[in-house]
Amino acid sequence: MKLGFIGTGKITSSVVTGICRSKISFKKILLSSRNRNVAKKLKRKFRKVFIAKNNQEIVNSCNWIFLAVTPKVGKKIISELKFRPNQKVISFIATINLAQLKKAIGKKVKIVRAIPLPPISIRKGPVPICPPDQQVKNFFNKLGTTVEIKNEKLSNNFWSVSGMMAPFYELLNTVSNWLVKRGVKRDDAQKYITSLFVALSEDAVVNSRKDLKYLVKDSQTPKGLNEQGVKELRKARFYISLEKTLNSILKRLNKV
């Protein structure tokens, strides 16, 4: 199988890194040269990675085509490419839906939308796909955990939550900086904070079969530090603000 990536940003770099370090069987990966620095770095790093002369060469040469460009670029270039029937197109573009992709491609190809995140480089994290596709499911299960979505409208909810990645890192950064301001060395602060949140996340995964509200309750003791923390953040409308932000992102996606 030959895999082609149109667009060479952070997500392409993460996905390609994950693929090359996984047990996925493939002949080669062909990259566009849109971001030549990223493309060259991946080519130097992995022997099966090559750089294409142009996007059409990728479409001509590969069985699976991954679209990893911005919506603005996608709307401009996809309709200019000449796809072949029976190719598989996996789109990472958040604001171009299936109907728009089908119209732009104009050929009978299998189209799947996917939402990979940077931790895919270490073969961690969820990868929602829509519509369900067994081959694509098996592929991403080797890079993380595939989540199949039948209703495309529902997929926008997952796209919205993917917008919480930078806010999460900003939370880690804020708490880490708080420790640094109080005399803790930055390396120690970051090691403690990242280790703490990894442990909390893993605990949540283990207990994910029950409602997460019980973890909120179980992590508090009467008049304890965690009770104070969650009460004050609720009073400051922190979680309401979080939900409003998710609603705002979803509203943007639903306009497509």
Sequence positions of predicted segments:
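Extreme N-terminal starter segment of soluble prokaryotic enzymes
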Residues: M1-G4
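NAD(P)-dependent Rossmann-like dehydrogenase/reductase catalytic/cofactor-binding core
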Residues: T194, V198-V256
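Aromatic pocket-lining residues of Rossmann-like dinucleotide-binding sites
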Residues: I19, K23
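Rossmann-like NAD(P)(H) cofactor-binding subdomain of soluble oxidoreductases
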Residues: V15-V16, L30, R36-V38, L42-I129, ...
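Short acidic capping loops at alpha-helix termini that bridge into adjacent secondary structure
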Residues: F26-K28, N86, D187
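Catalytic nucleophile loop
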Residues: T12
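Internal alpha-helical scaffold of NAD(P)-dependent oxidoreductase catalytic cores
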Residues: Q100-K110, G125-F158, G163-N207, S248-V256
